[in-house]
Amino acid sequence: MFLQVTGTATPAMPAVVFLNSWRRPLSIPLRSVKTFKPLAFFDLKGGKGMSEFHEVELKVRDYELDQFGVVNNAVYANYCQHGRHEFLESIGINCDEVARSGEALAISELTMKFLSPLRSGDKFVVKARISGTSAARIYFDHFIFKLPNQEPILEAKGIAVWLDNKYRPVRIPSSIRSKFVHFLRQDDAV
């Protein structure tokens, strides 16, 4: 039932034992992975739809750089998260309050396309918007542009899933859904 242990065990460092059933994850070819198509969960006729971006201006800090003097790729996920949270807060959804209630809005997928690097002191804008929804998911688009010339830096797509207190996907609560509908139906003149 157990594999042979490699190395020797010491009192300070016990040997690690793997079950025979442990297997390396299989690689799935990209062509076999299903792509998602967001469902039209909200009736958005007559509103500005999902074209409105929320913008947040930021500045690169020295500790966000890698050994090559550019922003580390992992930091861009933080920038996108900040943009999403600011966007949600602007329409009346506070992520901290959601967490305190025992529920969560968690990113299940985030795909990023890096177009150009940012360096220390660069000013940039993160643009976030809702691109679609389903019963339990919210689809986001994110863009990062360097200021002042609006040079494209990053394009990202994310899927956020509404989770209950056991971290299982559930329908987006009607109180939250109504905030999305209110925002998305606002007239362009407002």
UniProtKB/Swiss-Prot annotation:
Tissue: Highly expressed in stems and flowers and at lower levels in rosette leaves, cauline leaves and siliques.
UniProt-listed Pfam families: 4HBT_2
Xref: Gene3D superfamilies: Hotdog Thioesterase
Organelle transit peptide residues: 1-49
InterPro entries: 4-hydroxybenzoyl-CoA_TE (IPR050563), HotDog_dom_sf (IPR029069)
Keyword Zinc among record annotations: no
Location(s), subcellular: Plastid, Chloroplast
Single GO MF descriptor: fatty acyl-[ACP] hydrolase activity
A Gene Ontology cellular-component term: mitochondrion
Residues annotated as catalytic: 66
SUPFAM superfamilies attached to this UniProt entry: Thioesterase/thiol ester dehydrase-isomerase
Biological processes, Gene Ontology terms: lipid metabolic process
Enzyme class, first EC level, given as a word: hydrolase
Keyword Hydrolase: yes
Role according to the record: Acyl-ACP thioesterase involved in the production of fatty acids and beta-keto fatty acids. Can produce fatty acids of long chain (14:1 and 16:1) and beta-keto fatty acids of medium to long chain (8:0, 10:0, 12:0, 12:1, 14:0 and 16:0) when expressed in a heterologous organism (E.coli). Possesses thioesterase activity for lauroyl-ACP (12:0-ACP) in vitro. May play a role in the generation of long fatty acids in the chloroplast.
PANTHER family named among the record's database cross-references: 4-HYDROXYBENZOYL-COA THIOESTERASE FAMILY MEMBER, NOVEL THIOESTERASE SUPERFAMILY DOMAIN AND SAPOSIN A-TYPE DOMAIN CONTAINING PROTEIN (0610012H03RIK)
Similarity comment: Belongs to the 4-hydroxybenzoyl-CoA thioesterase family.
Name used for this protein in its record: Acyl-acyl carrier protein thioesterase ATL3, chloroplastic
Organism in which the protein naturally occurs: Arabidopsis thaliana
